[in-house]
């Protein structure tokens, strides 16, 4: 079993963001944004971020198979999620594409200290929370980086249930 970190870039400066990653010993950053760019914060565009991380000795990888912004299926049974984007992501988590993305993430995490990154500052407002549920349900440790000195171990999201040893977001609807 491995430990995986998560972080949101938020509105931080490039320097502050790199300092936070270095403080937590991050060696590889896995970008799970579906669209790895930012008009407001160009330091987090894929090319700029990759360059600044390389200068700091941190490897950058984009992992679109774990990207967010997924629409729910019409027949979605993940009704514990009221938010349609989270329900859509829960549907995506049931695909081979998602599972292969997680397998590759874990392969990297077995060899290096990895953080999964998206834009949202707090993990509970981001699809990182669902990735974290999946990892935790499969016996891995997930730590959310909040700032340079603060991390939080992932608690399951309120929508998550473990049923017969499997993560489920089935609701009462």
Predicted regions and their residues:
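Residues lining hydrophobic/aromatic ligand-binding pockets adjacent to catalytic sites
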Residues: 1-173
